[in-house]
Amino acid sequence: MVAETTAYRTQNAKMGCYQSGPTYRKEPRNSAISRCFWAFNYIYACIKDCVLIDPCMGSGHILVYAFDVLMDIYRNQGYSDRDAARLILENNLYGLEIDERAYHLAYFALMMKARSYNRRILSKDTKVNVFEIRESSGKLKPEYDQYLGNYKDLVQYLINEFQEAKELGSIVNLSCTEEQLDELEKHIKHLKANALDVDLIAQTEIDEIYDLLMPLIRQARLLVQKYDVVITNPGIL
């Protein structure tokens, strides 16, 4: 056991959480990931705000290791394994991958790791923030314009930027903001929710818009948001 005998106080301005020492914890795993997360444990009184992304995650080895490190920290802060497993998936770990098979392996590995701490995790509607990067189809159909309104330019921008996403992967550099993506997502979901109130042709077109844009919006959000830790092992670069 390591005693942190120097009293400290950290505040997260966003969450308004405070913590003061001394505290006691097990010696963390001896790796760069461990040291980084334990440092953020002191910077962020609420570990839920510490976010890591592997932008070239492959089959998820780094994310799975980071999961165990984060579990140590959550336990140190008094969380149960069941709650910590869900919070790690939903709040802390993000990943992108261009290969579909590797993405499925990463998703499976993370869910199995989470299940080792929470046996009910598979029966819950848990949000997992790992995605396969998808390419766009190229151009918008003219008939989509009536549904997109003021969002047409943003949609066309995303489609243009992701035309070669399978080649470029996470190095795609987007100039849009999270706020713009949030507004677009709300608009698309609103269209989907009200699709039953329109004729069959319109329903089909709205479904096509939803299926085309939602994956692009999700991966765009991961590319534009900020992270505390970015770590990867891109062997092909």
Predicted regions and their residues:
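SAM-dependent methyltransferase catalytic region
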Residues: M1-L237
